[in-house]
């Protein structure tokens, strides 16, 4: 019997002769490309509307070339200066040359504004000297100081040296109630100029208070929604969602009418006899008004995450605890409440993050005591036009949000977050 030899297996091919394995790989690649192509528009939108603006915000807080771009000669001399010795003749000569050029180009105001941000009161010094720059003759140090004695103050030159640096920590130092100096680095501002840290703490306090009130008011409502019959709970859910159908501005303005001294609440308390007509409570244009209005506006953001978690808790757990001898209160605390922690965490995180960034409500009802850091950011963006300081304040606020997000992930876990 002849030895039989096994012939090698031929690879399985498609109709066109291409190996089937290669065909499958090509089909899988095409399906992946189609899947990715569907995500590309969303990715581009997120990058353009979220990631890139945040990166630009962070960059704006540490980069400002307004002085160096308009005063190039002086910037070069300031780079070589140690910041401690008296300014030399070359520095004054560069100052005069740049003042002439900046006045001719009508850009002196931009450079002066940048120095004024570091050393208030120097803008007029720049503009007044720029008008006399053509008449200044050598020796420039003597003629410039003669034109305005403030140029002999070394602190003015130190401020210019700091502003001549495009990359600077000065705005973040200001946002933390400090200032950046040539010789000492970061130092605290004078007591009367320390406003931002207090605003940060006030923002945190109000946000935490609003979060606590929303939890205190929202937990029973969410419990009712989760335990009542479907028909009744749907009606209550409509009441919870009703504020979303009304403009935020309208809701905030309504609280002004309710809380003002001649408003509904004060009139009712006078009518009942709780307070005298000449001793009405001040409930608006202060921290109290801010807390009340923000609690009302943010309450649904606490109720919905709580409701979504409570709805998944089987009622049999409570019945089992009762059957084992637990009182209703003990069963609720020991069995039911621990299962709602993901909802408490999600609602608390959502309300707190929304509260620390709120602007329109504190602006309308807050007055002087109820202003938050967001109002100061808006001020620097719209009125003082110090965008770099606004970016630094926003960057610190963003860092605080990221810390909260990290803490939530460590304590509860992002995987357990339920928002609805």
Sequence positions of predicted segments:
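Interhelical loop and adjacent transmembrane-helix boundary motif
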Residues: 70-73, 77, 363, 368-409
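Transmembrane-helix boundary motif in ABC transporter permease subunits
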Residues: 22-23, 27-28, 56, 210-241, ...
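Amphipathic cytosolic juxtamembrane alpha-helices at the membrane-cytosol interface
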Residues: 27-28, 32, 233, 287-289, ...
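C-terminal transmembrane helix and the adjacent membrane-cytosol boundary/short C-terminal tail
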Residues: 307-318, 322, 391-420
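Membrane-cytosol interface at the C-terminal ends of specific transmembrane alpha-helices
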Residues: 284-322
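Membrane-topology segments of multi-pass transport proteins
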Residues: 1-37, 56, 60-197
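Membrane-interfacial helix termini and adjacent extracytoplasmic/periplasmic loops
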Residues: 21-28, 251-295, 365-368
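Transmembrane alpha-helices
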Residues: 41-44, 240, 296, 302-307, ...
